[in-house]
Amino acid sequence: MVSIRLPDGSVRQYEHPVTVAEVAASIGPGLAKAALGGKLDGELVDTSTVIDRDAALAIITDKDADGLDIIRHSTAHLLAYAVKELYPDAQVTIGPVIDNGFYYDFSYNRPFTPEDLEKIEKRMQEIAKKDEPVTRRVVSRDEAAGYFRSIGEKYKAEIIESIPQTDEIKLYSHGGFTDLCRGPHVPSTGKLKVFKLMKVAGAYWRGDSKNEQLQRIYGTAWTKKEDQDQYLHMLEEAEKRDHRKLGKQLDLFHMQEESPGMVFWHPKGWALWQQVEQYMRRRVNDAGYLEIKTPMIMDRSLWEASGHWQNYRENMFTTESEKRDYAIKPMNCPGHVQVFKHGLRSYRDLPLRYAEFGSCHRNEASGALHGLMRVRGFVQDDAHIFCTEEQFIAESIAFNTLAMSVYKDFGFEHIDIKLSLRPEQRAGTDETWDRAEQGLRDALTACGLSWEELPGEGAFYGPKIEYHIKDALGRSWQCGTLQLDMVLPERLGAEYVAEDNSRRRPVMLHRAIVGSMERFLGILIEHHAGAMPAWLAPFQAVVLNIAESQVEYAHSLTQTLQKQGVRVAGDLRNEKISYKIREHTLEKVPYLLVVGDKERDAQTVAVRARGGVDLGVMPIEAFVERLQEDLRSFK
């Protein structure tokens, strides 16, 4: 007798072992038809999996997130099947699920073209319509390796050699194609109805630039055509909002080959940067932080003591001088501990909150660099809080409150919070981790925030909270972090004198709100499609004269506004007013101030708001008041 507990709490009993598909069929024909897989005692399995023991089971359909993952994984295999049919000499490697889709890497003797992708996608559709059953079998390591060698698939044979001896080797087959995979997969290819191949890119075997270069075909797959259409529309909109394109169009920044992963900020871009930095500076100062500045280059011995030299060396830029090794800092924390250690600290000094707009450098692979989103040189709105164990919950509450307020001011209303919990390999006792994790939970609860818990995802030195902001296109970006550190204060010898005169280690909280300033500015540019709110815009207004006779008035008006703190420029060129309006409209300036003879004589200005909205003619004081109202409204 096998007892199966279903998600609603009901229990079904079966005389003999049953498959997931048979359980679904016993519940109803609709569920049997919709079943894509099962979740057996928390593990995803195929519908063909036999259940021979009492267990908890959920039937997975396309309404579940896991169901969509199964569809995407199976579509990756469908892609490989189609490629092998059309291009038999191509070798298959790996094909995982990624956000919004999948990819599969191939080794082939020529580049795949857009025309090839069309053929492959058409063949995938033909195979899917055949509704071929997908079968799974478990085989020995030798049998699997021998099979793939016999058909010339050397990459698959190499993968098998790297699989742990304790793991099962599973082969999935449909039609004339067999692939190595952990699974699970859909029961038949007919379940794969909505998919599209997107692009081809280069990739290295096992992600190592020393290995062969492969071709990576990306695709997307969905349960409904409407969902795919919505996603493709979002991609079109994302392309229009691409910060690299807007950075060029709005003359904000550029990057060049001589300095990969580093940003050349132009005047308008640097003005935008300064608005963000000065805003953040005001917020952390108001929250009781003390701003510091630490060296960019520090001796190897400090990085060895912190553990970075041993564990992070390949991502650090290093240099040598007078027979001493140095590293350009990839992060600010060791330097902040040095400031804390400089002098004897008392419990009365705590909490101490050190903030720094710290310039860091990391040796990211050149292939991973992506505009402002992935760089080698970046500035963090970094801070470290040194406090007692009794204070860390209050400090966490204060940080949560600050972070939520900052995100709202920048126009981000939807924040997903994730709490990463203890990994298997970790420092500290279970009791210490219990207190740390519960303390972060209590802080989130006190702020009225909901969160998702990620067991095993914490760093070895402590749990952390991550803050994921959603942009205007619904994309999620992890920006903020609150990381509790149980290790670094001890490694670097940080201590304070407790009330009983004993020496104790402070609790150290690493925290950032925007994270990398470069990346956050990229997110901001795309979120607002380059049309920054007036409080952030590099120029809040541009004064435009219609003819030569208004040049003096337009110039005087520009100076008057500048003295009142408005970021304004004057465009006094001898060009048609329609040309100047169009040019500054494309630059997404919040306000265009047009002056002709009537405005000059009346000492007024004609105001056009972004989007072509005509606000009419008004005295300059009225415009300044309107702008000030805009600036107040963001808070």
Swiss-Prot record:
Per the UniProt entry, the signal peptide is: none
Q: Which reaction does it catalyse?
A: tRNA(Thr) + L-threonine + ATP = L-threonyl-tRNA(Thr) + AMP + diphosphate + H(+)
Q: What InterPro entries does the record point to?
A: aa-tRNA-synt_IIb, aa-tRNA-synth_II, aa-tRNA-synth_II/BPL/LPL, Anticodon-bd, Anticodon-bd_dom_sf, Beta-grasp_dom_sf, TGS, TGS-like
Asked if the Swiss-Prot or TrEMBL record annotates the protein with the keyword Ligase, the reply is: yes
Which residues are Zn(2+)-binding? Answer: C333, H384, H510
Where is this chain's protein located in or outside the cell? Cytoplasm
Enzymatic class:
ligase
Q: In this UniProt entry, which cysteines form S-S bonds?
A: none
Biological process per Gene Ontology, one example term? threonyl-tRNA aminoacylation
Record's Gene Ontology CC terms? Answer: cytosol
Name the segments for region: Catalytic. Answer: 242-533
How the cofactor binds, per note? Binds 1 zinc ion per subunit.
GO MF annotations in UniProt: ATP binding; metal ion binding; threonine-tRNA ligase activity; tRNA binding
Could you tell me which residue ranges the TGS domain spans? 1-61
Q: Cite the EC number.
A: 6.1.1.3
What are the record keywords, sorted? Answer: Aminoacyl-tRNA synthetase, ATP-binding, Cytoplasm, Ligase, Metal-binding, Nucleotide-binding, Protein biosynthesis, RNA-binding, tRNA-binding, Zinc
> From what superkingdom does this record's organism come?
Bacteria
Role of this protein: Catalyzes the attachment of threonine to tRNA(Thr) in a two-step reaction: L-threonine is first activated by ATP to form Thr-AMP and then transferred to the acceptor end of tRNA(Thr). Also edits incorrectly charged L-seryl-tRNA(Thr).
NCBIfam families from the xrefs?
Answer: thrS
Q: What HAMAP family does the entry give?
A: Thr_tRNA_synth
Q: Which family does it belong to?
A: Belongs to the class-II aminoacyl-tRNA synthetase family.
Q: Which PANTHER family match?
A: THREONINE--TRNA LIGASE, CHLOROPLASTIC_MITOCHONDRIAL 2, THREONINE-TRNA LIGASE
- What is the name attached to this protein's record? Threonine--tRNA ligase
Q: What is the lineage of its organism?
A: Bacteria, Pseudomonadati, Pseudomonadota, Betaproteobacteria, Burkholderiales
Gene label:
thrS
